[in-house]
A protein has these predicted regions:
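N-terminal intrinsically disordered, low-complexity regulatory domains
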Residues: 41-46, 86
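Short, well-ordered amphipathic alpha-helices
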Residues: 57-63, 101-106, 213
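Long, contiguous juxta-domain segments that are non-catalytic but functionally important
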Residues: 34-37, 43, 54
Length: 259
């Protein structure tokens, strides 16, 4: 486990160094936010089974840069992995790993950006034949994300997505309207030292809204990062009818950008 974390952190450092030096295709680059944070639930007991760590690793590999001679019009393959680690529990198991590979097209629009893509997201558990059947979850969807970046540092993003998901041993739309949602709405701010973002995802499940919010303060090469999460946005195995996941508050480090 320690070896795995060492390799992951080393690779992240290499990606960050490459970004600073302006490496070109086909080098890996950071894609979505990368962080390592730890914390506790804000509801229910705090103990070795509920406290733990969360980390996210996300990279993109350019496949075709400056398509049609237009700078910034790039096609890439991306991969994001989010892990929930019950470090303090017996044997320190990973409670959930969410894997999200995809193909993405980035379209520059002056200060703004348009991102189109096809993404698969799953927790990697088999669909049939084992005791994990009841917790196998996956979604496949197209998405359209528009980000508006203002001179003041304000950032507004809308992400619309539609597809099909695997739930209760069948492909269904239920995972979208009940747990995953069809749209994400983000309000953020960035400056030389600060980054802030809050994302709301309307759903029709018990929570009514998945919320993910974070604040980062740059300190040297990294940023001190605090994150609040509420709803079904973290663990796909929490997608259970009638189940109410706990809200979490976590603190740690952010590598790169939050927005």
């Amino acid at each position: 486990m320690k070896k795995f974390l060492f390799i992951a952190l080393t690779l992240i450092s290499c990606i960050q160094a490459g970004a600073r030096e302006g490496l070109r295709s086909p080098s890996l680059c950071a894609f979505r936010p990368m962080y390592f944070i730890g914390g506790v639930p804000l509801e229910g007991p705090v103990n070795k089974s509920t406290a733990g760590f969360k980390f996210q690793f996300s990279v993109a590999l350019p496949l075709w840069k400056s398509m049609a001679g237009r700078e910034g019009l790039d096609l890439c393959f991306g991969y994001t992995q989010t892990s929930l680690w019950d470090f303090f529990d017996d044997s320190s198991p990973f409670r959930e790993n969410v894997y999200a590979p995809g193909i993405y097209l980035s379209v520059p629009l002056e200060r703004d950006n348009l991102l189109l893509g096809l993404e698969h997201k799953s927790n990697g558990r088999p669909m049939r034949g084992t005791s994990d059947d009841n917790y196998s979850r996956s979604v496949n969807y197209f998405f359209f994300e528009y980000g508006a970046f203002f001179h003041s540092g304000l950032v507004l993003k809308t992400n619309l997505h539609a597809g099909v998901g695997w739930y209760d041993e069948e492909f269904t739309q239920e995972v979208f309207w009940r747990f995953h949602g069809y749209a994400d709405f983000t309000v953020g701010y960035h400056s030389d030292k600060w980054q802030m973002a809050a994302t709301a995802t309307p759903v029709f499940g018990p929570f009514g809204m998945n919320i993910d919010a974070g604040v980062a303060r740059k300190i040297g090469s990294y940023s001190l990062f605090i994150q609040f999460n509420h709803g079904y946005g973290e663990a796909l195995s929490d997608w259970v009818r009638g189940y109410h996941p706990a809200s979490f508050l976590r603190l740690g480090i952010l590598i790169g950008n939050l927005l």
